[in-house]
């Protein structure tokens, strides 16, 4: 409804930014829904899309890697999808009560970020 209202009133934008923060038991469904939403936004508004914020709990790094690998694979062939940014990957467990980073308690990156190297 937001972009419909903006478009109807002559609003303009360069890129639509999206966020996605699934859990280990929801990422498959949420990735599918996110890709459908990306395709809908492109179709409806002709806009480029960027996943500006993604993340999962740091202590389930393997699930997070699977989530990211799947999402990267599903979006890489969508020309209008500009990319994916992990939000605050350097955050470690409990940093300012934020638990969705991709570093462990020793301050090292988890395997979650390996998805970006594939």
Predicted regions mapped to residue ranges:
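Aromatic-rich peripheral "rim/lid" segments of glycoside hydrolase catalytic domains that contact
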Residues: 33, 40-46, 58-118
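Glycoside hydrolase catalytic-domain groove-lining segments
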Residues: 1-63, 73-77, 81
């Amino acid at each position: 409804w937001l972009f419909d209202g903006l478009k109807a009133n002559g609003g303009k934008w360069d890129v639509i930014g999206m966020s996605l923060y699934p859990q280990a038991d929801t990422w498959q469904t949420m990735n599918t829904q996110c890709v459908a939403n990306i395709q809908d936004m492109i179709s409806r508004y002709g806009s480029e899309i960027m996943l500006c914020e993604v993340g999962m709990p740091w202590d389930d790094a393997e699930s997070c890697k699977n989530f990211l690998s799947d999402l990267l694979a599903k979006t890489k062939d969508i020309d209008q999808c500009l990319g994916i940014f992990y939000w605050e990957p350097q955050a470690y467990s409990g940093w300012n009560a934020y638990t969705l980073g991709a570093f462990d308690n020793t301050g090292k990156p988890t395997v979650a970020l390996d998805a970006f190297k594939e």
